[in-house]
Amino acid sequence: MANKLRNYTINFGPQHPAAHGVLRMILELEGETIVRADPHIGLLHRGTEKLAETKTYLQALPYMDRLDYVSMMVNEQAYCLAVEKLAGIDVPIRAQYIRVMFAEVTRILNHLMGIGSHAFDIGAMTAILYAFRDREELMDLYEAVSGARMHAAYFRPGGVYRDLPDFMPKYESSKFRNAKVLKQLNESREGTMLDFIDAFCERFPKNIDTLETLLTDNRIWKQRTVGIGVVTPERAMQKGFTGVMLRGSGVEWDVRKKQPYEMYDKMDFDIPVGVNGDCYDRYLCRMEEMRQSVRIIKQCSEWLRVNPGPVITTNHKFAPPKRTEMKTGMEDLIHHFKLFTEGMHVPEGETYTAVEHPKGEFGVYIISDGANKPYRLKIRAPGFAHLQGMDEMAKGHMLADVVAIIGTQDIVFGEVDR
């Protein structure tokens, strides 16, 4: 009688370079075919929800940046919208346009990282180099408005921290750059931030084309992604998939279109939808989403150029007065002191607010008991639902395809483990 091969179990991660952080998976293999994939989470658990209950509403805001640390400002946006809904704060129109613009900048940042690292994991190294070149310019936008390249804390309940600056920081001369290269780098930085954004929007679609040239019709890329990790529309909805993971399966659901928030109902853009629900279709959706984000950014930039105005609410129970006023007026000083020591008091109630995060539907559920701190803060992370589909998506595929499936899910453990 022939000896039957026993299934064997291996650990994937948490030190694996394609684990996207601290993913540990126990894989049961029959030869090189996956029989079972069991993700183990919690290695990046930092107790964000509990920590937020011990901080004022403003102090809890920077924790949002650290959830999905590739899409910082969209996390902030969900939190701010939830607080504003509970408190009944009216956000100035200009602030809403700035938020929408930076949410789309963040979407491009996320997709460049997602596609670049996905290709890199599979073995196409060039894509990530091109992706990081463009991400660098968008990181400069973050730095120009907030002073930080990653954890911006730029969105605030009631608006944004400050208006767009009138200039962009320039590259300085160094022994690594000659005068010609320096001039080339600073060419788009001569004017205002909006000039820089417009120049980026003109240039970026060509850079997306370059990425597409590297990957879209690449025979090896298609062999590694077509027909891999297929999810039917029915299973995608049953599993709670959102964002590209749902649209890649052919379900046209985008919170920006179906339940518009901020200024998205005024924007003209399309929703890319996949057909086959595999890794390749999800890649194509992300590519097209970047093009649509450029369209939205252009519309915001046009409006912001001709419509000056306040960028944060004038209700000083929720947002501080300007520093110049605070230093000259007693009432303004009191408001400032109360806000930054005691914090804002949000009326009793509860709300769930969802935004179209680059990875899916990012939701924030807040219960307020009328105090200066949230009574309960629950975060609905899109990646958490996607990771639960790992077993179903990987079953029957080869060991090497696990890497492609993790990449297509675009998992970041800051939000999964919270």
From Swiss-Prot:
Q: Name one GO molecular function term.
A: quinone binding
According to UniProt, the reaction catalysed is:
a quinone + NADH + 5 H(+)(in) = a quinol + NAD(+) + 4 H(+)(out)
Pfam families hit by this protein? Complex1_49kDa
What EC number(s) does its UniProt record assign?
7.1.1.-
**Its membrane topology:** Peripheral membrane protein
Q: Tell me the superkingdom of the source.
A: Bacteria
* EC top class, as a word: translocase
Mind listing the UniProt keywords for this protein, alphabetically?
A: Cell inner membrane, Cell membrane, Membrane, NAD, Quinone, Translocase, Transport, Ubiquinone
Q: Which InterPro entries is this protein grouped with?
A: NADH_Q_OxRdtase_suD, NADH_UbQ_OxRdtase_49kDa_CS, NDH1_su_D/H, NiFe-Hase_large
Record has NAD as a keyword: yes
Please give an example of a GO cellular component term from this record: plasma membrane
Subcellular location per UniProt equals: Cell inner membrane
Q: Provide the assembly information.
A: NDH-1 is composed of 14 different subunits. Subunits NuoB, C, D, E, F, and G constitute the peripheral sector of the complex.
Protein task: NDH-1 shuttles electrons from NADH, via FMN and iron-sulfur (Fe-S) centers, to quinones in the respiratory chain. The immediate electron acceptor for the enzyme in this species is believed to be ubiquinone. Couples the redox reaction to proton translocation (for every two electrons transferred, four hydrogen ions are translocated across the cytoplasmic membrane), and thus conserves the redox energy in a proton gradient.
Protein family = Belongs to the complex I 49 kDa subunit family.
Q: What is the protein's name according to its record?
A: NADH-quinone oxidoreductase subunit D
Q: Which organism is it from?
A: Neisseria meningitidis serogroup C (strain 053442)
Name of the encoding gene: nuoD
